[in-house]
């Protein structure tokens, strides 16, 4: 029972701790099967909150565009983006990623980019996830993202993760054992 819902929900890559193209992965990342069609969002179960997050497939959750916690997380990430840039400028070690909206086949998903550098108001990097809304883009593909389009950021140091505000919201959808494992990694 899958149904496309126009505009009401947004897909979020849920890769706790951040995917890493250079090998330092915290364990929950898996390649996602893609097709030329957009991912379908399941209907709410009978009696369930119609605005509640919905698992689409492994590591992909759909959040309603009016989800207050997710929108607050994106706002906090945007407000603290200068801290991310300062960590980069100061040479703080770690894997740097930013989340941004990626549109293909008329569908938008929110996906991570592993940062390689900055070019003015743009961030250079490589897709850290396999997109689910088509095959135009591939994990590892080089891209540039406008700083204004960044919805979240993370610096993953293995034993500590800075930022990751949307990932923190997504933790609420994980089983308790997994959630506890990742919650202790996040720092402000």
Spell out what each predicted region is.
Residues 2-112, 116-188:
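Mixed-charge, low-complexity intrinsically disordered regions
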């Amino acid at each position: 029972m899958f149904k496309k819902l126009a505009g009401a929900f947004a897909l979020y890559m849920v890769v706790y701790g951040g995917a890493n193209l250079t090998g330092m992965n915290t364990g929950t990342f898996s390649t996602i099967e893609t097709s030329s069609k957009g991912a379908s969002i399941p209907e709410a179960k009978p009696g369930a909150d119609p605005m509640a997050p919905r698992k689409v497939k492994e590591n992909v959750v759909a959040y309603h565009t009016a989800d207050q916690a997710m929108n607050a997380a994106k706002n906090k990430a945007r407000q603290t983006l200068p801290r991310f840039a300062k960590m980069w400028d100061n040479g703080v070690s770690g894997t740097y990623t930013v989340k941004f909206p990626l549109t293909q086949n008329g569908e938008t998903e929110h996906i991570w980019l592993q940062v390689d550098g900055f070019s003015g108001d743009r961030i250079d990097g490589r897709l850290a996830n396999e997109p689910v809304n088509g095959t135009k883009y591939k994990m590892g593909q080089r891209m540039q993202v406008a700083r204004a389009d960044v919805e979240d950021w993370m610096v993953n140091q293995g034993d500590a993760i800075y930022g990751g505000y949307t990932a923190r919201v997504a933790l609420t959808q994980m089983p308790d054992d997994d959630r506890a494992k990742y919650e202790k990694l996040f720092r402000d």
